[in-house]
Regions:
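Paired small-residue
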Residues: 95-103
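Helix-to-loop junctions at the C-terminal end of transmembrane segments
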Residues: 57-69
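Helix-breaking motifs and short loop linkers at transmembrane-helix boundaries and internal kinks
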Residues: 69, 90-92
Length: 142
């Protein structure tokens, strides 16, 4: 099984790093909101717009993959997520954060969609279950 995962190691490492980054961002956000004395409603809105962004992103995935391909789409989504994270660190306005969280939701779900689509496309039927099993272990360990 480990030999079957060899070609997928970079994608699995990327998934691990992305999920760890999302976990850190989701943990730091409430702490920053508390430091800014933001209300519970603002915290709820920030969470809501993130998942709204994920819903929007699912509608864009097919178009993005068809237009750009897996490698370019993944690189663009990870870069855009990084830019949003850096902007959130520089700007201390929860209302601006809502726009950034909306965008991060879109970019995150698109990156996940690209990874899973690529794993599905690149793996043969005989090892697909093992590949996706390893992917899910990596995602849940992060």
């Amino acid at each position: 099984m480990l030999t079957a995962l060899g070609p997928f190691r970079p994608v699995l490492i990327a998934a691990l790093l992305m999920m760890v980054g999302q976990g850190v961002m989701n943990s730091i956000l409430p702490v920053r909101l508390a430091q800014l004395d933001a209300s519970a409603q603002i915290a709820g809105l920030l969470t809501t717009v993130y998942f709204l962004g994920q819903m929007i992103g699912t509608r864009l995935g097919h178009w993005l993959l068809h237009r750009t391909g897996h490698i370019r789409a993944f690189a663009a989504m990870i870069a855009a997520t990084g830019v949003c994270t850096l902007l959130a660190a520089m700007i201390e306005d929860p209302w601006v954060w809502m726009l950034l969280r909306l965008a991060m939701g879109v970019f995150t779900v698109l990156a996940i969609l690209v990874m899973e689509s690529w794993l599905n496309m690149a793996s043969e039927n005989s090892v697909r279950g093992s590949v996706f099993g390893a992917y899910m272990v990596v995602v849940y360990l992060a």
